[in-house]
Amino acid sequence: MAVPHWTPADIPSLGGRTALITGANSGIGYRTAQVLAERGARILLAGRRPASLAEAARRLRADVPGARLETVELDLGDLSAIRDAAAPLAATETLDLLINNAGVMDVPERRTTSDGLELTVGTNHFGHFALTAHLMPALARSTAARVVTVSAIAATWRSGDLDDLMSERHYRPMGAYAKSKRANVVFTQELARRLDGTAHRALVVHPGSAVTNLQRHTSSGRMGRLFVALAARTLMGTADGAAWPTLYAATHPEAVSGTFIGPAGRDQTSGTPKPVPLPARADSPGQGAWLWCESERLTGVPFPALQT
């Protein structure tokens, strides 16, 4: 059910709360950081390129005078870099919100991360899985932490089936992207099950169709051009409106753990956030347990329990 009149103006004060946002230097991530900072949250801007992070911090301080923020250099395609970036935060921080927002899309040819994982799923899913695992001690210090992972409408595509997760038998750029986004949903469902009975929540969102810097990672190939063209014809939104599902999931007091949140408008392209149907089998405990075990095995990162 959509929340008919909800807008980011309804977000309560977030003073005393800390949020880490990946991919926060532009697009949906930047807009999310901006709104949370306006509500008083302390923001940790996480991104791969130091120069882009510094520019984002400069812009955010100009947009939100008095904003409390820091930058975290983080390459989600490098498991060692994730571990090193997360270690000091896990040791000292109290993290109330973790927003797994960064992503890559439509890599033209099959490539791998520095750890040998297919690049798209390695960044979009395995990188965020490892980051979340490493940050669990910081999340556990919060009285009510939330992990919000940004998926995409592509999670519902048939090509998003998790068979051949690493695209070893057959690689298609948008198929790999759909798999990574389906994995985001399945991961969140399993995390929500593991958080059941605690004060903590895990939610997954999709932003509809938005013109953001993710399109800069889109190839000039036929599928990439087709995706952007179709999105443009379906009222492709801006990062402002596309950030609403993330902001709702991160802040609304009644947001339910395990829910998939997307826009309420036609074809889920834009509009007020609402719970939307999960992709096929995404809530299967068997598939969730399988992906969890595969993620621990392939990343070498054991996922600790998060207690109340």
List the model feature ranges, each with a label:
Residues 1-220, 298-306:
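Rossmann-fold NAD(P)H-dependent dehydrogenase/reductase core
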Residues 224-226:
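Flexible internal linker/loop segments at domain or repeat junctions
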Residues 26, 49-50, 113, 235, ...:
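Generic alpha-helix initiation/capping and coil-helix boundary signal
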Residues 78, 164, 251-252, 281-284:
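Polar helix-capping/helix-linker motif
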